[in-house]
Amino acid sequence: MNELMKILGQGGQSLSFDQIKIQMASPEQIRSWSYGEIKKPETINYRTFKPERDGLFCARIFGPIKDYECLCGKYKRMKFRGIVCEKCGVEVTLAKVRRERMGHIELASPVAHIWFLKSLPSRIGLMVDLTLKELEKILYFENYVVLEPGLTDLKLHQLLTEEQLLNKQDEFGDDAFRAGIGAEAIKSVLEGIDIDEDKVRLRAELKETTSETKRKKLVKRLKLIEAFAESGAKPEWMILDVVPVIPPELRPLVPLDGGRFATSDLNDLYRRVINRNNRLKRLIELRAPDIIVRNEKRMLQESVDALFDNGRRGRAITGANKRPLKSLSDMLKGKQGRFRQNLLGKRVDYSGRSVIVVGPEMKLHQCGLPKKMALELFKPFIYSKLEKYGHATTIKAAKRMVEKERPEVWDILEEVIREHPVMLNRAPTLHRLGIQAFEPVLIEGKAIQLHPLVTTAFNADFDGDQMAVHVPLSLEAQLEARVLMMSTNNILSPANGKPIIVPSQDIVLGLYYLSLETPEFRNTPDDKAQAFGTLGEIEAALHARTVTLHTKIRARLHTVDDQGSPIRVRVVTTPGRMLIAQILPRHPNVPFALINKQLTKKNVSDVIDAVYRHCGQKECVIFADRLMGLGFGQAAKAGISFGKDDLIIPAEKQEMIEKTAGEVKEFEQQYQDGLITAGERYNKVVDAWSRCTDEVAGAMMKEISKQELGRPINSVWMMSHSGARGSPAQMRQLAGMRGLMAKPSGEIIEQPIIANFKEGLSVLEYFNSTHGARKGLADTALKTANSGYLTRRLVDVAQDCIIVENDCGTERGLTVRAVMDGGEVVSSLSERILGRTLSEDVLDPTTNKILYPRNTLIEEEHAEKIEKAGIEVVKIRSVLTCESTVGVCGHCYGRDLARGTPVNIGEAVGVIAAQSIGEPGTQLTMRTFHIGGAAQRGAEQSSVEASHDGIVTVKNRNVVLNSQNVAIVMSRNCEIVLADEKGRERARYRVPYGARLLTDEGAQVTRAQKLAEWDPYTLPIITERAGKVEYLDLLDGVTLVERMDEVTGLTSKVVVDYKQNARGVDLRPRLQLKDESGDVVRLSNNTDARYFLSPDSILSVENGAEVNAGDVLARIPREGSKTRDITGGLPRVAELFEARRPKDHAVIAETDGRVEFGKDYKAKRRIIVKNDETGEETEYLIPKGKHVSVQEGDFVRLGDPLVDGPRVPHDILKVLGVEALSDYLVNEIQDVYRLQGVKINDKHIEVIVRQMLQKVEILDPGDTMYLIGEQVDRLEFEAENRKREREGERPAVAMPVLQGITKASLQTQSFISAASFQETTRVLTEAATAGKVDTLNGLKENVIVGRLIPAGTGSVMNRLRRIASGQDEAKGVGQETPRLSGQEAAE
C-alpha cells in the first residue's frame, strides 16, 4: 500500500478537512517545515544555469530541476526514485516538489515581526505595555530598556538613552541592574510574561478600575492575552529567530532572451536578508565594536521588515528601476493579490468571445454559435467521437482531421452539440442573469446570435457588444446549466419577481400599433361594426383592404369558460387585437379583456406575468416567442417614423414665458423693497421657472397627443406612450423648453434655457447647457466604479446568508403597512406582503373570522383579498426576526422571486440580495438631478391638496386663530388624515408648524381641494397669545445686528451667532410677551411665553410692539436650497448601508416628556427632557448654532426630533428598536430607487440589514466571561446565555449594534472571507494572534479553498457528506468517506 502511495505521489496529509486554523509559527515549527538552511545569497550560476548549492534556489534543499534527475546527472529515470545522489546531494523525485518545499534562514540576532509590531493596535506593544514609539526606539537601537531594576531607583521597562545608561552604571555599578536594547531585549520581556497569571491580575484590575480610558486599555490587553492563552501560542514567537523561505517555484527566476533574467522581487528581498545576516555573523565572530554590530542588527531588522511588508515602516526598498519591491504582504493584498486574482477569480479554458448580433428567428432557449468557435470549443468531444466511429485511429489523426476541417468533422460537430448547452456571459456581470445557458445552433459567420428577449437581462445592445461563451464539461455541470441556468428558466427577475423577458422597443411599438385605439374606432357605435365569424374571414378582409388593423369589428372568439371547457364568445375588438388573441394561451384566468386594449410596455409585461402565473413556464416561453415575432413583423409593416415637424411646439409657449418673466420681475421688486431676502428671491425665481417649464411641457404633450379623425396619430407620441423609446422629459427638451440648468457645483442657474432643440439654442444658452452635460459625462465614469464597489461590499457582507431550514418556528415578525408619500400610495400593502409568510392570523375586520392562518405564504389572490377586506396592517415574518442559527429559514424569507415558488433550502439569498441592490446601482445618479444636465427639482411644496374625496380628521391638532380668523397650526407633528365613508384611511399628510389650516376636523372635502398652505422658505416663530413684545438679551452689536441690504437699502434685525463674541457667551437671546399688568403671559402648557431665537433669525416685531395670537414674531430663512443638498442616489444608498452618521443629523428624544432648557455651556445648549410620570431626566447637549425645533414646555414623544435633520440609524435602533430601524432603512433606500423607477423587493434590503445587526454590545456581563462594552457575535452570545441559564448562573445583558457593511464584512466569523475582502494584513494579524479557526461556512471561504460552495447543489453534497460522516462515526470507521450507495444517496 505504501509503495503504491509513493508511486501516486500522494503527500502524507489527507486532503479532506472541515476547518482551517491560522496561528503564529514557533521557531521549531518553521525549522520542521524546512528542508535545509540557506546560507548563501546566490541564486543560480550564470554560466551553467544550475542553482548554487546552499543558495536561494539550491536543488539539495528544494529538490531537482528536472523530473527524476539529479543535478549532476548521475541518476536519471523513474527507477532511481527516492535515492539521494551522493555527489550533489539531490533527491531524485518530481520537480514539482520545488513548489512545496521550504527552506529557512537562521538569524544571528532575533528580529521583530513587523505585522505584530506595526499593525494597529500593536500586538507586541499591548503585550509588553509600551507604546509603538517606545518600542521602535528599542527595536531600532536608539534607547535601552530596563529589564531588571534591582535595588536602583529605575522602574521596570523604563527607557534610557545611552548617556543615561552610562550615568546610572557609574552611579550604581554595572551589575546592580539589567538593561537591554534591540529585539533581544523585547524578546526577554516577552519571555518573562506569565499568561495565566496576567489573566487573573487583569480581571481583578478591571473590577476595581473606575476610569473609562484605563478600562478600555485593560480590556484590549486582556482580550489579547486571552487569545494567546486559548491558542496556545507564546508571546515570544512574535520575535523571529528563524525566517522561513518560500519554495523557489513561487518566486521564479526566468531567463529572458538576450542572456538577462527576470526575477521575482522576493529573491532580492531574501538576498538582502541573507547578506546582512552573514555579515552580522562575521562581525560577531570578529568581536567587532558594539556600535558596528548594532548598526548591522538594525539593518537586518529593516531587511526582514521589508521582506514581510515593504514600505510599512520607513521608505520602501526599491529595485533597480526605482520601483518599490513587492513583499510577501503585497502578494496577498488588493485586486492583484493572491486572494482576489488567483483564488476568487480564476480564468477557465473552453471559452471564447465574439461580437453579438440579433437572432430573431431563434427560439428563446437557443443561441447562434459560429461554426469556427464551436469547432474549437468542442474539440475533445469531437476527437472522442471521431475515434468511436472509426474515422480516426488515434487522437493525433483526429486532430489532423479537425485541423483540415474534413466534411465528416462537421457532421460529428452537429451531433456533439445537440443537447449540450453552452453558457453565455456579458461583462459586467452585475447579477446572476448576466450568465445564462442556451442550446447552440451552428451558424455561418463569426458573430454570436443572441435572442432579442434576453437582452434586458444581459443589459446588452447590438452596437458592438461582445459576449463570452463557456462550455460546461462534466455531466453535472451540463445538468445544472440545463435545469437551473437555461434562459427559459429565468423568466422572472430575482430582484422584484416581475418578468424580465419582456418585449422592448420595436416589439412594443409593433404590438402597440396592432392594438391601437383610433378616433375612428371610438366614433363607430358597436352595433354598426362589421361582424366576422372566423379568423380566416378577418384575414381575408384585411387582405382585401375592406378593414384595417384598427377598424372596430365584432368577432367570434374561441376561448374557455371557468371550468376550462371550450366556448365561443362574441367580442367587440379590432382585427389587430384578434391577431394577438390568436397566440394567447387559452385559460380561464387569462381573459381576452387582458389584451383588448391599447398595449403599452407595462400592459404587455402584465400579460406575460399573468400567462406565467396561470399557464406555467412552458406556455409562457412559447407565448413570449410568438409575441416577439408578431411585434417585429407588425413594426416592420407599420413603418412608423417621424420627422422634425412631428415635434410640435405649443402655441401658448410664448405667453407662458412672458407671464413667468413678469413674475420674476415682481420678485425682483419685492426684493428691492426689502420684503424678501436674497435667498428667498432666488428660491422663488427658480420655482417660478421650474413651474413654467412643466406647464410648457404639459401644453406640448397635450398638443402632440391630440387625436383627430382623418389625421394620423403622432409617431413621437406613439413611441413615448407605448414605452418603446423616449420619455416626456426628453420630448420636453426637443419641443418644449430646456428649462433650468445646474452648475457643476449643484447650484441652479436662475436664468433658464427658454429655447428647445428644435428652435435651436443661442450661444449663451448653449454655453450654459454644456456645464451640466459635461458634468453628466464625468459623473457616469465615477458612477460605474462606485456602483461596482458598493456591490462588492454588499456581496461580501451577505455571502454567508443561505437558506438552511424550512421553518425556524419563531413567533416574531414585522408589521407592514402601505407606504404613503404626500398622500399618494407609493407602495400598496398587497405589493409589500406578496410572497411573504404571515406571522399572525389575519382576521376579517367585518366578521372577525380568520381569513388566513399564520404561516400562510401570501400569493397574488391572497394579497388582493386582504387589500379588498380593508385590512391596513399585516404582520409578516422576516429574515430580520428569523431565529435560525446559521443562515435563515425558508418561512421567514418567503417566496423565491425568480421562480414564484417557496424558496428552496440551499438558496444563496444573501448574494441574490446583494446583486439585486447593486445591479441597478449604475442607473442611480451620483447626485439628485440630471437629464442631460437639466436641473430637476420640484417646486418646493407649499400646500397640501386632497388626493381623494373624504372626511378630514386632524391628528395632534393644536391651532390658534389669528387676526384674520385663520387657523394657524401650532403643533410640531400635526397630520391631516383623509378617510372614506367606511372610515378607512385613504391618505395622510404632514402639516408643518406655522401652516394656515384651510379645513378642520370632520369637514367633507373633494379631490384637489387645498387643505393647508405655508411658506416653504422660512420657519416662523408664532405666538399663541396676544401681548406686548419685550426683547431679552438682544443687545445691538452683540446678539443683534441691523443688516442693511446693499441693493434695496432696507434694514432688517438679524440675530447673529453670538458664541464667537466674548460678551455674548452667556446670553440667550429671546422674546417674551407681557400682558397689560406687565406680567409675563402664561401659555396653555403652563410655561412662560418666552421664545428662544437661534442665529440667523430675522425679527418681524419691534421691541414693545403689541401682537395678536397667531402673529409671526420672527422667521428663520431656510437657505437657498441648492438642488436640495440631500445626498441622493448612490452616495445615499452607500451612506445608509455603511451606517454613517449624516452631517447635521437630528437629535431624537429617548423618552416621552416635557422639554426644558438647562444652563448653557460655552458652545452648547442644554436641553432636558423630563418624564412627568417617572420623573427621570435625559440631557442633550446641542451646539449653539443649530436650530432647536422645540420650544420650552413642549411635550415630546419617544423618537421625536429635538433638532431637525436626517435621523441617525444608530439612534433609531437604540431608542425605537430593530423593527423601526428596518422600517427606516428599507423606506429610505427604496425612496432612492423609486426615484429612478427601479423596483426592488423589500426582503433583499432586509437580508442586508440582518447582516448589519450581527453583533451585540455587552452592557452587563453577568456570570459570563465577557467584558463590558465588548462586541460579540449575536449567535455566540445567545448560545453562551443559554448555557449560563442551564447552569443556573446570571446571563449577560446586551444591546444590538448596527455596523456598516464594510465593518460587518471585516468582522465575520471567517477570517479567510474577511482577508480576501479588505485590509488583508490587519485581518490576518488579528486572526493569527487569536489562533482563529475558520469552519468554512460561507461561500467565499469554500471558493478560496477550492470546494463546492455550501449553497444550491453544493448544499446537497454537504448534507450527504454530513450524513455519511455521521454513519461512519456510528460504525466506528475511519475518516475516509465511503462512496454512498444509491439507496443512501437517494435519502
UniProtKB/Swiss-Prot annotation:
Domain of life: Bacteria
Keywords for the protein's UniProt record, in alphabetical order: DNA-directed RNA polymerase, Magnesium, Metal-binding, Nucleotidyltransferase, Transcription, Transferase, Zinc
Keyword Nucleotidyltransferase: yes
Residues that, per the record, bind Zn(2+) 2: 808, 882, 889, 892
CC cofactor note: Binds 1 Mg(2+) ion per subunit. Binds 2 Zn(2+) ions per subunit.
SMART domains xrefs: RPOLA_N
The keyword Zinc is annotated on this UniProt entry: yes
Binding-site list for Zn(2+) 1: 70, 72, 85, 88
GO CC aspect terms: DNA-directed RNA polymerase complex
Reactions accelerated catalytically: RNA(n) + a ribonucleoside 5'-triphosphate = RNA(n+1) + diphosphate
GO BP annotations, alphabetical order: DNA-templated transcription
Binding, Mg(2+): 461, 463, 465
Entry EC number(s): 2.7.7.6
Name of one Pfam family that matches: RNA_pol_Rpb1_1
GO molecular function terms noted in the UniProt entry: DNA binding; DNA-directed RNA polymerase activity; magnesium ion binding; zinc ion binding
InterPro entries on file: DNA-dir_RpoC_beta_prime, DNA-dir_RpoC_beta_prime_bact, RNA_pol_asu, RNA_pol_N, RNA_pol_Rpb1_1, RNA_pol_Rpb1_3, RNA_pol_Rpb1_3_sf, RNA_pol_Rpb1_4
Listed cofactors: Mg(2+); Zn(2+)
Location of the region described as Disordered in the Swiss-Prot/TrEMBL record: 1367-1387
Annotated function: DNA-dependent RNA polymerase catalyzes the transcription of DNA into RNA using the four ribonucleoside triphosphates as substrates.
HAMAP family documented for this protein: RNApol_bact_RpoC (MF_01322)
Similarity-based family: Belongs to the RNA polymerase beta' chain family.
Quaternary structure note: The RNAP catalytic core consists of 2 alpha, 1 beta, 1 beta' and 1 omega subunit. When a sigma factor is associated with the core the holoenzyme is formed, which can initiate transcription.
Annotated protein name in UniProt: DNA-directed RNA polymerase subunit beta'
Species annotation: Granulibacter bethesdensis (strain ATCC BAA-1260 / CGDNIH1)
